[in-house]
Amino acid sequence: MKKLFVVLVVMPLIYGDNFPCSKLTNRTIGNQWNLIETFLLNYSSRLPPNSDVVLGDYFPTVQPWFNCIRNNSNDLYVTLENLKALYWDYATENITWNHRQRLNVVVNGYPYSITVTTTRNFNSAEGAIICICKGSPPTTTTESSLTCNWGSECRLNHKFPICPSNSEANCGNMLYGLQWFADEVVAYLHGASYRISFENQWSGTVTFGDMRATTLEVSGTLVDLWWFNPVYDVSYYRVNNKNGTTVVSNCTDQCASYVANVFTTQPGGFIPSDFSFNNWFLLTNSSTLVSGKLVTKQPLLVNCLWPVPSFEEAASTFCFEGAGFDQCNGAVLNNTVDVIRFNLNFTTNVQSGKGATVFSLNTTGGVTLEISCYTVSDSSFFSYGEIPFGVTDGPRYCYVHYNGTALKYLGTLPPSVKEIAISKWGHFYINGYNFFSTFPIDCISFNLTTGDSDVFWTIAYTSYTEALVQVENTAITKVTYCNSHVNNIKCSQITANLNNGFYPVSSSEVGLVNKSVVLLPSFYTHTIVNITIGLGMKRSGYGQPIASTLSNITLPMQDHNTDVYCIRSDQFSVYVHSTCKSALWDNIFKRNCTDVLDATAVIKTGTCPFSFDKLNNYLTFNKFCLSLSPVGANCKFDVAARTRTNEQVVRSLYVIYEEGDNIVGVPSDNSGVHDLSVLHLDSCTDYNIYGRTGVGIIRKTNRTLLSGLYYTSLSGDLLGFKNVSDGVIYSVTPCDVSAQAAVIDGTIVGAITSINSELLGLTHWTTTPNFYYYSIYNYTNDRTRGTAIDSNDVDCEPVITYSNIGVCKNGAFVFINVTHSDGDVQPISTGNVTIPTNFTISVQVEYIQVYTTPVSIDCSRYVCNGNPRCNKLLTQYVSACQTIEQALAMGARLENMEVDSMLFVSENALKLASVEAFNSSETLDPIYKEWPNIGGSWLEGLKYILPSHNSKRKYRSAIEDLLFDKVVTSGLGTVDEDYKRCTGGYDIADLVCAQYYNGIMVLPGVANADKMTMYTASLAGGITLGALGGGAVAIPFAVAVQARLNYVALQTDVLNKNQQILASAFNQAIGNITQSFGKVNDAIHXTSRGLATVAKALAKVQDVVXIQGQALSHLTVQLQNNFQAISSSISDIYNRLDELSADAQVDRLITGRLTALNAFVSQTLTRQAEVRASRQLAKDKVNECVRSQSQRFGFCGNGTHLFSLANAAPNGMIFFHTVLLPTAYETVTAWPGICASDGDRTFGLVVKDVQLTLFRNLDDKFYLTPRTMYQPRVATSSDFVQIEGCDVLFVNATVSDLPSIIPDYIDINQTVQDILENFRPNWTVPELTFDIFNATYLNLTGEIDDLEFRSEKLHNTTVELAILIDNINNTLVNLEWLNRIETYVKWPWYVWLLIGLVVIFCIPLLLFCCCSTGCCGCIGCLGSCCHSICSRRQFENYEPIEKVHVH
């Protein structure tokens, strides 16, 4: 049975009588004082056993507690300001259903605010709601609005019960509370706590709304329902739960200091996230970081934390091995102790006389070194040494002593000692700086002098762990352990708080793996090289150990010479033997080295591109010699003597070598005839294959390659090799590949990967056509795995998107489809106009890019290729990788939103946009069914542009098939089954795999081919909706196109045969264009080098598709660049050099590769900006050219626009503009207006429609005609507008004044003239040939001539193209002269004479006919003649047509 003790402190009254309530009760809670105790017990329940800690936070206090009683109006509220936290309670005394009232608590902030709304449903599981959202929250609410609709982008939207366990009996036993900080919000609700991390600004203003007192009285007073406890300052409570008893008490002495320095170790040895890290420093052996974030290995995993209130004046000993953890605060670990940290809590006052007199370090071998500091620079036995803790009153000079002799001067003690950390490897840190290094240390002891000080320490036995450390002013302020999947992402992104989004998963470190070696089988001979180093040690005049330069190096004898030794075998192994002799004051070294004179010989890298201790690690050479003389040497090793206090270089060992594969260093003798290859298949292995090193998975393939031993990618990575013994080809793939993790609210909810195996702790999975997706969402077995996910499978709203991929909060994966609309039925054209005399109908092609293929780059994978040491170096570049990855991600998200808003599909239009619907008249209105052969006989060529419904390629046209099937990509990693095939490893990886292995992941485009075809098909179908003024039903496509032809080119009395002439020309042009597409693409496919000289539209398509692949290929090739390092392979560098030297070389690779990545990102962002402008142009073309008819000449093709159709193309759309190109012109003299005079009055008349031109014909009469085509007619008064006078006023200005009048004025002629003048010396008139001209589509003849030499096949294709182009050009349409000009001409005399003769001749003939046939016959003849003369020809009426622009 736990015993509970509570000591509560009385807080001062905050508001007093000025508290803004109608009725105020300020009192201690009384018999409900246990609320605070219960709250603290719940709060501290996360503490491990044996914890004794002071909790400091904005906790609830005993006083003040207020009860606000309002009137019955629910639109009133109370406002409190400058709060840090708020707690409230529901009073249960004498409360019935009639007394229950709701409550709305609002905490205002920017951009996020908080609301907690409580209803009267106290027994409901969802009686209240908390919202943390962006927006302005209401101060009052209603029970029916228990939602978070007032805000957006909610961080928390959660309903909860008012009473724990949904029972009214449990009400009143729990406090509700809110705490808000700049980077976190903590909510305490129904016994549970919620911590939400995000950045926000809080005003400290809190409002209470909807609270009111009931009108019922209990014992003559109004009932107190809601009680509030505003908190303005930090409160401290001490919690001790040792020996199974939990005690909560008030902290009264040094509470703030205790909270700042003492914590309870969490299970696993972790330091609590809310610990302040007061006086904890970043340990470093080099420069000290002032401020910033970095991922590093630091001793931050606590095995035991010992809070020490004070020390006695006695010696204390602390050992790394066998330390007793009896006084630990919190969890205890049994890990190996790496560093013991002494954290000192002192005030700013001088603390002389309080500290340690000396630190004794018991090093390996039994030698004890002492560290102490003195107020004078010269130490002696008579001076007093100490290491004062806290602030010192003057400089202190520190030394290392052995047996009272100062061996080494360390430097000046910092003016304030806050932390001392000592590692078992012999490093002594003060305030994080490496003050001294020696041999490994077993134990530490020191004498303490604390006097009457009331200070306390903490002693932390720690181990090294990887963590993201935030440093401010050289001190640690926050630590995030890289101990979980989501924390690993935080570490890779160098941020403690992850925003919602996709993040590349950093490669996991490869631990101890088997070693695979592949060598050529041969007869091997082996040589053992034993090098003996004899060190000579003696003491200086002050007693310090000195290594003599007379130390000698002995090489094996070869050819009676011991100065040079060359390897003459196939293999060798090098071993070093070290001896140590000492002397007194002379140079006769006979004594054994003991105590501080004990030294060992080490061979350092020196100037060689490989380390001495890596020679036996399968390094290969053509020649290798060791020499004691520098003559002819390529490099040298430094031979040093390592003592307990320092290292001293005594000699040099020179190396003569040549790179190659004839000689190999091995760890042991393997002489004889055999294949020394050792392979570990189908598992992660550390390999050395024909001298190329790395880490990967080796798999056997079925591939057969006749030549080569090993095969590499453009980046230089090993992709496969051949075993020459049996000819088997093996593939080499990475142990792990990059993946994209979906993070929502700080939790990994899913991951995109090509590996079909569990990762990131995610067990549920599904597959897509492009990759595998693992998630927390439980995909049931009812789903047929291996089929593509459809967005309808999971009904949820995606929280994060990347390209066309979306992930919901529950981890479900959805594809983001285009927006669907109903498609309004609106007319698209109006009126009928006449046509020119002669013209050609032309179909012109234009390609516009709409979107790009998004690329995700795992920066650490690209730069380091999974090497753990390189990853540590990469963290020194702080946010370089984060900036690169976020730039690509944000660009992709921006494009996703823009393209998604652009593409929408009308289902009704989609059904009509097909060849089947085009050739059908079943849906025609009866008025149109009378027309014969309404379908393909008129515009049969449309079948190549309109989509065809089929099961495999729905909504794709014939031209789209050609474009998507025959456009050649250049090195672009496509998102298809290749990604899954890469990780199979049963074939040699291609470029796609090489990019994927190096962290380059090409994701599906925002709008893939199917979406684009649906969108363009919907555009085509939309033309058929109500094309002729809104009929009862939709009409086929052909009729809609006819309406547009009529609008531009036909009169109301045009003959049906002229429509057929137009349709025939169109059909011929489209048919030949379709064939040209196929032939041109065949030519491109045969030789992609000819892209620049083939048709313009196709060349642009080809360029758009290939440009990103070329950029990715170039980025991959950069991995082969060594950037002045000794190798482009990081594994090879670490295999050759010691860690310190290899770090310097790898740093060059990191800098170079980051530069390459930055260049790629800059190129990508620039390209996205260009595509953004291109996408806007495409939208304008769709609205003006496809959905309507353009009045702009040249915008929708070069001519008078008739109609346009759009087809999907790779990464964009291809437009087919049908235009009229005039071939004959009528020259007229235009008049701007008419000036008329009437006596003294003069006035002017100008044409009202600016599209009309007034001109005088040859008959001296005036006519009006449209400017776009010659259509003369007699003017009417409605065509003119009268103006007051005929005078024209001009503003006199100079050329220099024009910019002030017309800001965008540019004198084009003068500008061109200036350019020509500048380049006149080198400028000649170009020779332009006009013999080849194509007025209809494309001119490919001249370009094809440039391609003839490339291949005979391409030449044959050009012959066919020439024929097709001739057919295209033969689309000249000569229509009847339909323009009518009504004139009155006076006939000459000979015309009248001829008429008279005809009459005289015809009258006898007519009389003869009448007499011959009888009276009735004569009358009938006359009647028939009269009827024929008087009647007029009847033409079929056309309905009036209206024209609108559909936006």
From Swiss-Prot:
The entry's keywords: Coiled coil, Glycoprotein, Host membrane, Host-virus interaction, Membrane, Signal, Transmembrane, Transmembrane helix, Viral attachment to host cell, Viral envelope protein, Virion, Virulence, Virus entry into host cell
Swiss-Prot/TrEMBL GO biological process terms: endocytosis involved in viral entry into host cell; fusion of virus membrane with host endosome membrane; fusion of virus membrane with host plasma membrane; receptor-mediated virion attachment to host cell
Residue ranges annotated as Virion surface topological domain: 29-1388
Keyword flag Transmembrane helix: yes
Tagged with keyword Magnesium: no
Region (S2): 775-1447
Domain of life: Viruses
InterPro entries associated with the record: ALPHA_CORONA_SPIKE, CoV_S1_C, S2_sf_CoV, Spike_S1_CoV, Spike_S2_CoV, Spike_S2_CoV_C, Spike_S2_CoV_HR1, Spike_S2_CoV_HR2
Membrane topology summary: Single-pass type I membrane protein
Chain spans, region Heptad repeat 1 (HR1): 1035-1154
Main location: virion
PROSITE patterns: COV_S2_HR1, COV_S2_HR2
Function: S1 region attaches the virion to the cell membrane by interacting with host ANPEP/aminopeptidase N, initiating the infection. Binding to the receptor probably induces conformational changes in the S glycoprotein unmasking the fusion peptide of S2 region and activating membranes fusion. S2 region belongs to the class I viral fusion protein. Under the current model, the protein has at least 3 conformational states: pre-fusion native state, pre-hairpin intermediate state, and post-fusion hairpin state.
Subunit structure: Homotrimer. During virus morphogenesis, found in a complex with M and HE proteins. Interacts with host ANPEP.
HAMAP family: ALPHA_CORONA_SPIKE
Protein name: Spike glycoprotein
Gene name tied to this protein: S
